[in-house]
Amino acid sequence: ISWPDKYAKYNGEIRHNRAFLPDIMATFIDAAETTYPKTYHGGNEIIPLEGASMLPILTNTDTELHEYIFGEHFDNCVVWWKNWKAVKDQNSKVWELFNLEKDRTERVDLSRENPKILKQLVDEWNKWANTHYVYPKGK
């Protein structure tokens, strides 16, 4: 994000905070000092915005926007938490677990060594999936 008129003293600094696509819309809404609509065309409900504004990251590099980040696309599943990432591809029923701090290229599956962490991430992903129109798809 570059906003010289408002954040000039941070110009050129790089942030490594984790964010995802819905955070872009939330950031635009925050920057415009407006709110996300709840309805459109005479009262049709809009699904609430999922993201969080990234503007706080500009002034505080310790800001965590989300405890977990989730995703799913054509049965490819992902969940991030702290330095951990769990993934399952569309051809597999098995989740893999990676420590991104030690293994940025996701080469070493740690699911057997860390079953509690994997279970926590998969449980959180399933909660998210059940509330975000991922299921039912044969679960």
Predicted regions and their residues:
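Short glycine- and hydrophobic/aromatic-rich loop-to-beta-strand nucleating segment
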Residues: I1-S2
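Intrinsically disordered, low-complexity polar regions and short flexible loop motifs
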Residues: D103
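Active-site-proximal N-terminal segment of extracellular/periplasmic enzymes that hydrolyze or transfer
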Residues: V108-K116
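Short, well-ordered alpha-helical scaffold segment located
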Residues: K6-Y7, E106
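C-terminal cap/loop subdomain of S1 sulfatases and analogous C-terminal strand-loop tails that border
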Residues: Y7-E13, N17, L21-L100, I117, ...
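Basic, alpha-helical interaction scaffolds
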Residues: D123
